Amino acid sequence: MDADKVKEEPQSVWEKAKPMFTNKPASGYYDPCQDFADRSIKCMRRNGNDKTMCSDYFQAYRDCKKEWTTQRKNKS
């Protein structure tokens, strides 16, 4: 995957996940950034747990989480 694409995705991921998150049952948990978490884990496995090789994936996950929490705070 192209590193630039990984960095640009968090906001679009939130927009795609927003309906699923807002329509979930009250007892349900939905993380729109789970895809980024999965990609990070796959990268770590692929690179023998070398964190330096996966820094773009980690940053994309952090950016997604930050965007998500900001959106939720603004909504409240």
UniProtKB/Swiss-Prot annotation:
The entry's keywords: Disulfide bond, Mitochondrion, Transit peptide
Motif (Cx9C motif 2): 54-64
Domain CHCH residue range list: 30-72
Gene Ontology annotations for the cellular component aspect, listed alphabetically: mitochondrial intermembrane space
Disulfide bonds, paired cysteine numbers: C33-C64, C43-C54
Function: Required for the assembly of cytochrome c oxidase.
Protein name (Swiss-Prot/TrEMBL): Cytochrome c oxidase-assembly factor COX23, mitochondrial
Organism: Paracoccidioides brasiliensis
Name of the gene this protein is made from: COX23
